[in-house]
């Protein structure tokens, strides 16, 4: 997503190749910082489209493929929230995949343990059903 587009801006003006490269690099960094994932186990496919189509494409992909990180393990795309928001609960992503330095400073633990989150992921992958909260 182009900068500003999630807040109602058009995100126009930035080179789309630079924006995409930066975002994919951020994602690679998030994976690389974990203590229990290896970046070489991941592959990436992407399609460059006009900014107007990004939200529609993203929504269709999420609805079609129902990826676990959108349904159960939220927090992969998060950035450092800064000191003012460190009292918030640690994301499921950072609970299951610890290691991002800024996330280690988050004060409140997730209400679920890494083991509980992992069990829900296995259940979802085996059954296609999102566990009840």
PLM regions with names:
Residues 2-133:
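Boundary/linker segments flanking structured domains
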